Every structure is written in structure tokens, then in C-alpha cells.
């Protein structure tokens, strides 16, 4: 019984920070830490000079809100090459996930039709291309199915998902084929 009790003096000394501990953390200003050179810290309080990444970029751009629709993971990147797709597929196979192809003809972007509440499920249901590729061990098998699906439905968007059958969840999803621009 006595071994499970702690005195309040012990708790107070553990939770109290000493002045030496409070000054050990170097300040961080902007995008570059000044911890290595404490004497060179700027004393200028001008708001335009607070954020700096060493002068490499003068202005950061934001995603344009008009004309560019958001699709899935990696949609902010340029279209993936065959080699990049193969690496993504190899990654999901290496993780033990089951590759599966899905396609959508009308609304491949984030679109709410059946439900208006925010969340992971946005009301989109994609059509599965054949069956999930159980036992698939090679990315070229998935790429061959992707090529067949894109020939069958050339105006659709096709995505590859990685499904974890142990946890019963979809772990990865990305657009693998976009139709040519009209």
C-alpha cells in the first residue's frame, strides 16, 4: 500500500520546469531555423520579412480554384508515367494489399450526390473492373488490366486501389488513367 503512494513534493519537482530547460529550445522564425546562428537573428519586426526560406522562392503559389478539378491521391502531380505507375503498384503489392481497378464514366472528381455531409464517403461509387486481383505478385499484371480497361472504356477515369483484406479497408487509391482532353 505504501509503495503505491507518491508524495506531493515529488510530483511538484517533476512537473516544474527549471529556467535552464526553458531556454534550451531555440526559436523558430519563418521557414528556416535560426538555432545554429543565434547571433544572426533578425530584430526586424516587419511582417514581410518574417517568413523566409533563404531567398530561393519569392512568392508561393496556391492551387487555382477554377478549371482544375480534384480527383484522388496524387492528383496535384502531372500524369504518372508507366514507370511511376509500376512503382506505385509494386509498393501496394509489397505492403500485402490486393490491387483492384475501378472506373467511372460521369463524375470522377469529388462530387456529392447521395449525401451532403462532409467526410470520407462522398457519395461516389465507382464500377469495379473485373474482380480484385487476389494473388497478384507482379505490377505488369495490373498494368495489363489497366491497358485493357482503358481500351474498353476510353472516356472513363480509371483508378487503382490497394485493399487490405486483413483490416478490411482501402489503403491506397490513385487515378491511373484519364481520358484525353476533348
Swiss-Prot record:
It is found in: Plastid, Chloroplast. InterPro entries: RuBisCO_ssu (IPR024681), RuBisCO_ssu_dom (IPR000894), RuBisCO_ssu_N (IPR024680), RuBisCO_ssu_sf (IPR036385). The basic functional RuBisCO is composed of a large chain homodimer in a 'head-to-tail' conformation. In form I RuBisCO this homodimer is arranged in a barrel-like tetramer with the small subunits forming a tetrameric 'cap' on each end of the 'barrel'. The gene is RBCS. It holds the Pfam family RbcS. GO terms for molecular function: ribulose-bisphosphate carboxylase activity. Signal peptide: none annotated. PANTHER family: RIBULOSE BISPHOSPHATE CARBOXYLASE SMALL CHAIN 1, CHLOROPLASTIC, RIBULOSE BISPHOSPHATE CARBOXYLASE SMALL SUBUNIT 1A, CHLOROPLASTIC-RELATED. Keywords: Calvin cycle, Carbon dioxide fixation, Chloroplast, Photorespiration, Photosynthesis, Plastid, Transit peptide. Heterohexadecamer of 8 large and 8 small subunits. Disulfide bonds: none annotated. The keyword Chloroplast applies. One of its GO terms (cellular component) is chloroplast. It comes from Fagus crenata (Japanese beech). GO terms for biological process: photorespiration; reductive pentose-phosphate cycle. Residues 1-58 form a transit peptide. Its main location: plastid. Belongs to the RuBisCO small chain family. RuBisCO catalyzes two reactions: the carboxylation of D-ribulose 1,5-bisphosphate, the primary event in carbon dioxide fixation, as well as the oxidative fragmentation of the pentose substrate. Both reactions occur simultaneously and in competition at the same active site. Although the small subunit is not catalytic it is essential for maximal activity. This is Ribulose bisphosphate carboxylase small subunit, chloroplastic.
